[in-house]
């Protein structure tokens, strides 16, 4: 049998051999996002500040990387870089651990401190680093951060701190625990000297760091979904023997429960911090600031609604009913139409954030001002979220927190009041509604900064008064201010709600009545004006008052305020 055999052949080169290397495509390193499981090009992730471009997951970054993301290029001057930890307790394997972690991370310990500029504003800074023993706080971390606050106090600088930590460094025993008290004392001295402290919480911030300087900032920001807790979730689950709800102890949880001012994506942190630094220096941020309000195309146009009324109200009760109309300008509209910018801040630092009270720092014509407003909302959904402008105790406590900051940093306070009254409910009473209002009255009576309150709608009883102890009280001509609603007055005194009209007249709750009684200091005429025009009139009147009040020293200001309220009331001696 014949078999076909493949003939042996020799490959023949079609051209001459060369020694040049073949070109290969550039290598790409890919990383899988632990949140959405998407595979991401490492270079793209780096360009996006280590944030997943698909789901927004914020990856952990080193302290120096965060410094480069935040500080103006070429302005950072490091402090105390020569401090390094030592094994003073002869703790098993600690010395070896310090050596290996230092070699791997290139750092001597878990924090980088110094001074630099953010958006042109000078500030002291510290950046904690999770790559060094999970950012645990030992003697060096405590010493460097403590020195940072001391240097800032001497130089008159604010402090911006980025926290990330697994808690105390157990290898240093109780000495580690004492760093909490040590840093807190330095924070207090810096604050008493009038210094601003901004904290940025990053994932994770836990244990002794959370229970000390992480939560001591005047303003507390947080990256999205950052774990922030005293006891970590695993510890709580082991102790309680139950699974924790999704989102528990995360940034958004803190915001809802009143423990941080805002959750800010990494890409916006530098601009937001720069904006806040500028406002606390007494000047406004530059053009393009994150919270600038752009009014392009509004001038000369009636974009606001006119009040829907066929004729001017003829009775006091008609005025009261008009204040409750959904067509009225809300506090939020007055802020957005009347100011050049506004940074809303959240939380009472005790229980929650009350959506009925909108508070923050605004600016107009180059002048910063603390704004505290009661917001009813416009749509039904929003009105329900804001509890129809009836504030809870946490709303009044948030207001008091920002009033104290206004005094500390020398900003005037503008209050916009539109409420039927403080919320009456079981939870409000359990959390001390009366105490919250009472503390505001005491705080405002002695606050060493000018206060102007404007009743823009309904001024209902103690809930309105809690934001109306002021140097100047103004009312819109269409607003009302009363100890009780006419309906409630008629029901309580006469057991007849049909006599509400009579009660409204008797209560003397209109702006002209209250001006005649010496309760208020002026009336802003809003008849027939658009929302934009009303906002302009309110802000113009308020800032004119600030001009006058700003010429007074603290003692004169508070004494005149005391005498103003001391003189209210009429009686006869028997």
Model-derived regions: residue spans:
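Terminal-region recognition feature
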Residues: 1-198, 204, 216, 223, ...
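Glycine-rich anion-binding loops of enzyme active sites
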Residues: 206-213, 229, 463
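Active-site pocket-lining/capping segments in soluble small-molecule metabolic enzymes
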Residues: 224-226, 233
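Catalytic-face loop-and-helix region of soluble metabolic enzyme cores
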Residues: 239
